[in-house]
């Protein structure tokens, strides 16, 4: 869905006299916007929405702050029960929620169903394991007794993307609600119906008012709220530019931030790999969600001994993908999320080709309504080209031929991003050796980078910092307080 933003007249608002007045005046200096969403399959207008006014958001923050005072003392049993109800509702409403995802951002319906299932699994995972992850940690100091108490910190803000509108929220909201924090979510402006559906699910599950709140505002207004002292931590999944802006705003009030800023994952194929298996995974790793995944396999680095075979089979597989309506079960390649996304990706391909890259397959927009672009393979890519340094967010694969394993590792690391990567080999120890040398947050052997509730997710370099999912993800926004007992009047 494309977000078409247009000004809406705002009546003057009177703010209560407290520490947030200056910030609220700053926020009021920007016009409130209206947002019109467009189905990327056919570029037809779906619905129009009004952005929340600053006064409404001010009330939401105040309500969240008040809710935190009771929620932080709620038992793990009660918090887990709420999350289990949320997961159950997601599963019961899977069909309608999946259709909503597909309508708003163009994901294949079958993949939308998978996203809802994974989101529910994440919520259940933290309901089942949160208490264990947050248990007191006993220490053994030289004198006395001590332990670490893990406590919630307050109101959190999550800035979430459109490409996985339920999954991204689940991995932010579920662990933090289980901790005892409360969450505000500023979702991408092109998935407003998904955003509203998530808030409605929490309400239906019996969440207290203020525990989970959707902030329907444009990205231009976010930084002022990040600086609000009542918000104690911020998480963002988005672009490098958005991450830098958020980190700067959070730094002004010295609050914790977690950033996941995309990637350009290397997919290394060594000469001893099962090529047919590698090709099958390459298609899935590159084309899942029409290539719009932060951890999608984007750079295919293949040793010379098997490069021709891999490229021929990979090309054949992509050539046969059926393009069409994402609601059609036979469709294998749907539209990008918006016309703007398709224009940007086509421009990246053109700039790369103009600089000398070769097109093995595709390379153009598809002549039909909607945000479609052909499945594309580029070769002969050199430093300085768009395809070399930029993240290609769509069905475009960059293919590199290298002499050996050592060259593959060097090329894999020659990227500003460091989110994920994968290596294909029949030798487990060799795969581990390569994985150890790749500078990323995640490496998978004989599988493209993937996600599941019990594995940590996050990157290095310009892919951001911090971790989500697993036991590591639940500890990002906690106060780890040292508590020490002493039986000595004076140990010295």
Name each model feature, range by range.
Residues 135-277, 402:
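Rossmann-like NAD(P) dinucleotide-binding subdomain of oxidoreductase/dehydrogenase enzymes
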Residues 42-48, 231, 268, 322, ...:
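Conserved C-terminal structural/oligomerization subdomain of aldehyde/semialdehyde dehydrogenase
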Residues 43, 79, 101, 123, ...:
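Residue-level signal for inorganic ion chemistry
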Residues 47-52, 67-73, 158, 267-270, ...:
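Short, well-ordered beta-strand elements within core beta-sheets of diverse protein domains
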């Amino acid at each position: 869905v494309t977000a078409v933003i247009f000004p809406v007249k705002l009546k003057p608002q009177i703010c209560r006299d407290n520490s947030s007045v200056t910030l609220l005046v700053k926020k009021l200096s920007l016009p409130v916007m209206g947002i019109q969403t467009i189905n990327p399959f056919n570029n037809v207008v779906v619905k129009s929405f009004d952005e929340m006014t600053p006064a409404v958001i001010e009330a939401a923050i105040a309500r969240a702050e008040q809710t935190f005072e009771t929620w932080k003392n709620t038992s793990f049993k009660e918090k887990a029960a709420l999350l289990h109800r949320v997961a159950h509702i997601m599963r019961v409403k899977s069909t309608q929620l999946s259709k909503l995802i597909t309508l708003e951002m163009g994901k294949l319906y079958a993949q939308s169903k998978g996203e809802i299932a994974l989101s529910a699994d994440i919520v259940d995972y933290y309901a089942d394991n949160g208490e264990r992850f947050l248990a007191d940690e006993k220490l053994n100091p030289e004198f006395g007794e001590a332990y670490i108490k893990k406590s919630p910190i307050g109101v959190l803000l999550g800035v979430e993307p459109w490409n996985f509108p339920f999954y991204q929220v689940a991995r932010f909201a579920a662990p933090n609600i289980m901790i005892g924090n409360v969450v505000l979510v500023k979702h991408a402006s092109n998935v407003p119906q998904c955003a509203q559906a998530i808030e409605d699910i929490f309400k239906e599950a019996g969440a207290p008012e203020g525990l989970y709140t959707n902030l329907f505002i444009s990205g231009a207004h976010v930084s002022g709220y990040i600086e609000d002292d009542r918000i104690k931590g911020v998480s963002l999944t988005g672009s490098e530019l958005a991450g830098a802006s958020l980190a700067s705003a959070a730094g002004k009030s010295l609050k914790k931030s977690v950033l996941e800023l995309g990637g350009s994952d290397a997919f290394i194929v060594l000469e001893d790999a099962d090529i047919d298996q590698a090709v099958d995974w390459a298609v899935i790793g590159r084309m899942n969600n029409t290539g719009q995944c932060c951890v999608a396999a984007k750079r295919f680095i293949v040793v010379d001994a098997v490069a021709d075979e891999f490229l021929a089979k990979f090309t054949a597989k992509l050539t046969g993908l059926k393009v069409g309506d994402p609601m059609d079960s036979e469709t294998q390649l749907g539209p990008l999320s918006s016309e703007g996304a398709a224009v940007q990706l086509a421009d990246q391909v053109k700039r790369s080709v103009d600089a000398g890259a070769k097109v093995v397959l595709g390379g153009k927009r598809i002549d039909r309504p909607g945000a479609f672009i052909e499945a594309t393979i580029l070769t002969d890519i050199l430093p300085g080209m768009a395809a070399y340094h930029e993240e290609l967010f769509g069905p475009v694969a960059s293919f590199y031929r290298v002499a050996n394993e050592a060259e593959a590792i060097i090329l894999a690391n020659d990227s500003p991003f460091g989110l994920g990567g994968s290596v294909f080999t029949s030798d487990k120890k060799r795969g581990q050796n390569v994985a150890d040398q790749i500078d990323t947050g995640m490496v998978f052997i004989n599988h493209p980078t993937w996600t599941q509730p019990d594995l940590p997710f996050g990157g290095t370099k310009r892919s951001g910092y911090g971790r989500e999912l697993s036991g590591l993800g639940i500890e990002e926004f906690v106060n780890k307080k040292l508590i020490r007992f002493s039986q000595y009047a004076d140990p010295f």
